[in-house]
Amino acid sequence: QTPQGEYASATLLRNQLRQGSFPARYLPPSAGPLYQNAPHCPADGLEQVVLWKLRTMTPAQLAAIAQVGEGLEHRILRAARKAASLEQLLALCGSKRYTNARLRRIFYCALLDISQEEQTGRPEYLRILGMGAKGREILSAMPQKGIPVTASPAKFQDLTQVRRDALAADLWGLGC
């Protein structure tokens, strides 16, 4: 979480914002007003629902979740029964091998029921979050075969990953 020169990790930026410190040095000037005026999501906004979900899962169900393997499901389920918070859960599950970042991904995959199977294939679509004139030029020159590329996933509601993205956004909104 230590900045590397001009760049800082997303985790560092989120933590600074949660602590009331504004990381202007690491953001483009145009982003400053957006971040300062936006509501901030608490770090623990979804922790109770994550703990509930894990406590209601069987070892087999958790073993089927993306990035879970080698008996990790047993470690997580034991810890979920003891933990009263997400921080406690991370402390009980974490190790050099199982980093907090990986564990958080697993917890949220469990919440969204994202299976190992779903994550082994290629992406169903590529979502463009932003682009300039050069990006639009490149996009228009791309062949329209293969994986769909879009800035508006609403066109692809029949794709599982688009529905998962929408569910994740809804859950995140509930946690804020």
Positions of the model-derived regions?
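Active-site cores that bind ATP or allylic diphosphates and position pyrophosphate for catalysis
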Residues: Q1-C176
